[in-house]
C-alpha cells in the first residue's frame, strides 16, 4: 500500500469492484451486462464532464430537445455516448432518451429496454455544479421488436435502476435485486463499492424545493413548507433546513446519503401540466432507489411506482425521501 499526497494510506484493494459485486447478485447475467455497459459509459461521461471548457464541450448546442428545452452541448454528447453503447450491448432490444422524441429499437428481440436522462441538471454544467445520469431498465417483449407501447410499464416493473452523479467524486448508485449500493469511481477508472446497503433515514429536518415558485404552489404544499419554516416555534416543534441544487441527481443523492425530502410539486404556472419531472426517465428510477433504500416516493397521494404511463415523455409531480416525512406531506395533500 502506498501513501497519498496527504500522507494517509491508500487502500484501494480493500474495496470490491462493480463487476465482482454484480457477480454476487442473483440477477440474470444479461441484465448485469446491461448495467456494466451503462456504468462503463458513465465513467467515460465523467471524464468528458470533468474536462469542461478544455474540451470545448460547454455552452449551448443551438438546438432544442423533444421537451422544447435548449440543449447544452453536453446533452447531445452524452446522449450519443449512451445511445451508441446501448445499441452495441447485446441484451438491449430498445432504448428511449429524454432528449429524443421516439424510442430507438436495436434490431434485437427480447432482453431489456433502457430509458435514460443522459445529463440531468445540465443547466448547471457551465457553472461547475454537480450533474448526473439517470437510467432505468425494463423487461422487453419476447416475441417482437419493441415499440413505444412496450416501454409504457409501471415503475414496479423495473429490473434495475440507478444514477451517476458527477461531483467532487463521481459516484454510481444502483439497484438490481433488492438493495441499493453506492460505488465511487477510482482514479484508474474502476467503480469501487464504498457505500453498501444504502438506507434513507425515516425522519428528517431537511427539505429540498425551489422556494422561488412558492406563490404558484397548491395550498397543501404551502401549508407544509410554512410549517417547516416556523421551526421549533410552530406545530412541527423542530427547526428545518432547506437545500436546493436544481439538479435532481444532486438533490436526491444528498437524501440517499443523509435523509431529507425532495419536492417538485405541481404548480399554477402551467396548470395543465401535472408536473415538471419525467416519469420514465427521472421519477421512476429515483423512486425505485428510494423505496428500496427504505424511503417513499409519491406524486401527491399515490406511489409513483404504481402509475401506469400513458405516454413516453409523461410528466409527474414528485415527493421523495424519508418515509415518515413523506407521510406528513401525503397527509397535507389529503387535507386539500
From Swiss-Prot:
Q: SUPFAM superfamilies from the entry?
A: Carbohydrate phosphatase
Its top-level enzyme class, in one word, is: hydrolase
Q: Binding residues for Mg(2+) 2, per the UniProt record?
A: 117, 120, 282
- Please name the gene that encodes this protein: fbp
Cited HAMAP family = FBPase_class1 (MF_01855)
Quick one: which pathway?
Carbohydrate biosynthesis; gluconeogenesis
Obligatory cofactor(s): Mg(2+)
Report the InterPro entries cross-referenced here.
Answer: FBPase_C_dom, FBPase_class-1, FBPase_N, FBPtase
Give the GO terms filed under biological process for this record. fructose 1,6-bisphosphate metabolic process; fructose 6-phosphate metabolic process; fructose metabolic process; gluconeogenesis; sucrose biosynthetic process
Protein EC? 3.1.3.11
**One cellular component (GO) term of this entry:** cytosol
CDD domains, per database record: FBPase (cd00354)
Protein's cellular compartments: Cytoplasm
Which positions are annotated as binding substrate?
120-123, 210, 276
Instruction: Please describe the quaternary structure of this protein.
Output: Homotetramer.
Cofactor binding summary note = Binds 2 magnesium ions per subunit.
Q: In terms of domain of life, where is this protein from?
A: Bacteria
What name does the UniProt record give this protein?
Fructose-1,6-bisphosphatase class 1
Q: Which reaction does it catalyse?
A: beta-D-fructose 1,6-bisphosphate + H2O = beta-D-fructose 6-phosphate + phosphate
